[in-house]
C-alpha cells in the first residue's frame, strides 16, 4: 500500500494541479476528497493547456482510475460541461468514478451564494459564487440532495419539492427576489444525472480495494490549509476540509491508510479573495511577481494578492496536516529580484509570536518579521537538480525547508511538467 495526499500549504493556487499531474504518472488511482468546481487547476498535457474544476487531473491517463469522492459537492451541470470539454478534445473519461454519496449543487445554491455575498457588502468573504457554501450548509443541516438521490427521479422530485418550499420562503421574504419552480430544475437536473449515471458507484469500495491490493493511490486536495474551515483564517475560508485529515472523511478511507502527505507551496505567497494576509506586497515587487507568475485565478480570472513567503503559515500547515514532504513551486518567478524576504515570525504588540493566531483581529495587527536573502539573476528554468541552481537560489530553497521543518522532495522552476524536479521520491 502506498498512498500520498497532496495538500496546499497556503491559501490555494500553490500549483497542486501540476504536482498532482506530475505524481499521477506513478499513481494508479487519483481521488479528490473535498470542494467542488470552486477549485481550478491548469494542466499542460502533450503541449496542450487544460483547465479542470471538478475532475481529477489524472483523467488524461486512460489506465488510471479517477475518483470524485463523497466529500465533494458536485454541480451536475458543470460536471456534464467539463466531460464535454474533455470529450471534444479527444480525452476519454471512461476511467472516472463518482461517489453516490457526494452532495449535489443545485441552482438555488448558486443563487443563495450570490445573494448572501451581496448582502454582506464590505464584510463579504470573497466566494467564487459557485454554490459551494450553501451546498455544504444543506449537507450539515441534513437536507442535502446526494448523487444517489439525483439518479432516482421519484426521490429527487420529493426532496427537491421539499427544499424549494423552504428556499423559496427565504428568497421571497429575506432577499426579496423570486424563487424557483420545481419544473425549472427537475427535468434538466435529472437528465444531467442520467448523463453521469454510468460513472456513479460507492467510491470508498474502489479506493479501499485499491489500497488493500497495494496499488498507488494519490489524493488530490483543493484550495489550501489556510482555507480549511477548521484550521484556516475563519471565516475567510472554504466550507470543507482541505487538510490531509479531510481524506479520511471525504474519500471514505481510514487514517491508517495514509502514508505520505506532500505539502505544496509557492516560493512566495498568494491569496484570492478577502481576509488578512500578513506578508502582502503593495509595491512594484508585488506587481512584478503577479505579472511574471501570471497570478490570476483559474476559476474567476481575479488578480491574486501577492506577498513574501510566510514560514509561519507553512509551519501551521505542516502541523495540522502532518506534512512529510515539501514541494516548492514557482522558484523561477523570483529570478531578478535583488533582495528576497522570508517571514520567520510575527510581532504583535511588541511580542514575537511563531504560531499562527486564531484571532483575525490579532492577525490583522501582526507585523511580519523578515529574514533577508540575496536574490539571483541567472535563468533557472532549465535546471534539473538542486546542484544546478545558482548558490543564492539553492540557499533560498534550503532556508525555506529549514524554517518550515519540512524536507524538500520536489521543486519546480517553471509551469511545464518537465520543469518539475524530484529530490526524493514521495512514494518510497
Curated annotation (Swiss-Prot):
Substrate binds at residues 298-304. It comes from the Bacteria. Its cofactor is Mg(2+). Keywords: Cytoplasm, GTP-binding, Ligase, Magnesium, Metal-binding, Nucleotide-binding, Purine biosynthesis. It is an enzyme of class 6 (ligase). It is found in: Cytoplasm. IMP binds at residues 13-16, 38-41, 128, 142, 223, 238, 302. Transmembrane segments: none annotated. The keyword Iron-sulfur does not apply. Mg(2+) binds at residues 13, 40. Pathway: Purine metabolism; AMP biosynthesis via de novo pathway; AMP from IMP: step 1/2. The active site is at 13 (proton acceptor), 41 (proton donor). It holds the Pfam family Adenylsucc_synt. It catalyses: IMP + L-aspartate + GTP = N(6)-(1,2-dicarboxyethyl)-AMP + GDP + phosphate + 2 H(+). One of its GO terms (biological process) is 'de novo' AMP biosynthetic process. Gene3D superfamilies: Adenylosuccinate Synthetase, subunit A, domain 1, Adenylosuccinate Synthetase, subunit A, domain 2, Adenylosuccinate Synthetase, subunit A, domain 3. Its EC number is 6.3.4.4. One of its GO terms (molecular function) is GTP binding. GO terms for cellular component: cytoplasm. PANTHER family: ADENYLOSUCCINATE SYNTHETASE (PTHR11846:SF0). Plays an important role in the de novo pathway of purine nucleotide biosynthesis. Catalyzes the first committed step in the biosynthesis of AMP from IMP. This is Adenylosuccinate synthetase. The gene is purA.
Amino acid at each position: 500500500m502506498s498512498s500520498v495526499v497532496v495538500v496546499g500549504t497556503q491559501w490555494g493556487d500553490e500549483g497542486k494541479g501540476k504536482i498532482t499531474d506530475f505524481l499521477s504518472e506513478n499513481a494508479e488511482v487519483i481521488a479528490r476528497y473535498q470542494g467542488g468546481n470552486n477549485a481550478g487547476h491548469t494542466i499542460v498535457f502533450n503541449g496542450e493547456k487544460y483547465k479542470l474544476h471538478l475532475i481529477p487531473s489524472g483523467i488524461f491517463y486512460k489506465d488510471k482510475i479517477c475518483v470524485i469522492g463523497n466529500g465533494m459537492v458536485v454541480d451536475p451541470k458543470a460536471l456534464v460541461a467539463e466531460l464535454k470539454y474533455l470529450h471534444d478534445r479527444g480525452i476519454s473519461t471512461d476511467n472516472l468514478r463518482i461517489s453516490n454519496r457526494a452532495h449535489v449543487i443545485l441552482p438555488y445554491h448558486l443563487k443563495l451564494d450570490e445573494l448572501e455575498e451581496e448582502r454582506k457588502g464590505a464584510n463579504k468573504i470573497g466566494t467564487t459564487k459557485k454554490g459551494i457554501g450553501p451546498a455544504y450548509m444543506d449537507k450539515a443541516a441534513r437536507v442535502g440532495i446526494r448523487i444517489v438521490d439525483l439518479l432516482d427521479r421519484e426521490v429527487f422530485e420529493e426532496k427537491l419539492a421539499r427544499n424549494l418550499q423552504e428556499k423559496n420562503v427565504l428568497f421571497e421574504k429575506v432577499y426579496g427576489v423570486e424563487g424557483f419552480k420545481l419544473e425549472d430544475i427537475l427535468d434538466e437536473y435529472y437528465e444531467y444525472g442520467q448523463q453521469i449515471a454510468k460513472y456513479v458507484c460507492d467510491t470508498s469500495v474502489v479506493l479501499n480495494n485499491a489500497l488493500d491490493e497495494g496499488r498507488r493511490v494519490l489524493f488530490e486536495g483543493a484550495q489550501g490549509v489556510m482555507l480549511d474551515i477548521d484550521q484556516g483564517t475563519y471565516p475567510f475560508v472554504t466550507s470543507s476540509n482541505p487538510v490531509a485529515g479531510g481524506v479520511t472523511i471525504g474519500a471514505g478511507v481510514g487514517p491508517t491508510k495514509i502514508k505520505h502527505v506532500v505539502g505544496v507551496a509557492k516560493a512566495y505567497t498568494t491569496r484570492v479573495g478577502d481576509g488578512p494576509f500578513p506578508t502582502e506586497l503593495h509595491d512594484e515587487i508585488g506587481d512584478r511577481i503577479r505579472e511574471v507568475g501570471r497570478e490570476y485565478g483559474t476559476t474567476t480570472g481575479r488578480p491574486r494578492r501577492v506577498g513574501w513567503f510566510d514560514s509561519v503559515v507553512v509551519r501551521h500547515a505542516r502541523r495540522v496536516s502532518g506534512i512529510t514532504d515539501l514541494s516548492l513551486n514557482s522558484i523561477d518567478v523570483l529570478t531578478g529580484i535583488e533582495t528576497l524576504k522570508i517571514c520567520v515570525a510575527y510581532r504583535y504588540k511588541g511580542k514575537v509570536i511563531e504560531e499562527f493566531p486564531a484571532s483575525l483581529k490579532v492577525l490583522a495587527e501582526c507585523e511580519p518579521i523578515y529574514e533577508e536573502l540575496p536574490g539571483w539573476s541567472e535563468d533557472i528554468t532549465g535546471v534539473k537538480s538542486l546542484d544546478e541552481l545558482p548558490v543564492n537560489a539553492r540557499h533560498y530553497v534550503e532556508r525555506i525547508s529549514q524554517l518550515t521543518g519540512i524536507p524538500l522532495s520536489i521543486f519546480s522552476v517553471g509551469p511545464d511538467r518537465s520543469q518539475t524536479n524530484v529530490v526524493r521520491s514521495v512514494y518510497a
